[in-house]
Amino acid sequence: MSNKVQRFIEAERELSQLKHWLKTTHKISIEEFVVLFKVYEAEKISGKELRDTLHFEMLWDTSKIDVIIRKIYKKELISKLRSETDERQVFYFYSTSQKKLLDKITKEIEVLSVTN
């Protein structure tokens, strides 16, 4: 088998194990984690920038992105703030406790062992 095909298969195995771990350990989907991590990387990000980034990087429909954002907001995993100058503009960020949770999850992922 070619190296590239083998790498894709290995990546899929690792991704499948990560999805299972996120679901069983933290009750979040991989899609929710991707959105959470994009906010984590930016620290504070506008809704438009978040949607655009996910749409172009992950090739997700904006309606899917909106559903995921609503779900993680309802789970209180992110916070949002409306712009004082333009009420239509929303920014997503983490409270101290939310950031601690994401710190914990990302550290756990770094040491997560993948089985062959």
Swiss-Prot record:
The record, for Gene3D superfamilies, names: Winged helix-like DNA-binding domain superfamily/Winged helix DNA-binding domain
Q: Which GO terms describe its cellular component?
A: cytoplasm
Q: What induces it?
A: Repressed by SarA and MgrA by binding to the sarV promoter region.
Specify the DNA-binding region ranges. 51-74
Tell me which Gene Ontology terms the entry assigns under biological process: regulation of DNA-templated transcription
- The region annotated as signal peptide is none
GO terms, molecular function: DNA binding
Which compartments does it reside in? Cytoplasm
Q: Which InterPro entries match?
A: SarA/Rot_dom (IPR010166), Transc_reg_Sar_Rot_HTH (IPR055166), WH-like_DNA-bd_sf (IPR036388), WH_DNA-bd_sf (IPR036390)
- Give the residue spans that cross the bilayer: none
Record's keyword terms, sorted: Activator, Cytoplasm, DNA-binding, Transcription, Transcription regulation, Virulence
**Which SUPFAM superfamilies does the protein's record reference?**
Winged helix' DNA-binding domain
- Purpose: Part of the pathway by which MgrA and SarA control autolysis. Involved in regulation of virulence and autolysis genes such as hla, splA, aur, scp, lrgB, scdA and atl. May also act as an activator for the expression of regulatory genes agr, lytSR and ArlRS.
- What family, per the record? Belongs to the SarA family.
Identify this protein by name.
HTH-type transcriptional regulator SarV
Q: What organism, scientifically named, is this protein from? A: Staphylococcus aureus (strain NCTC 8325 / PS 47)
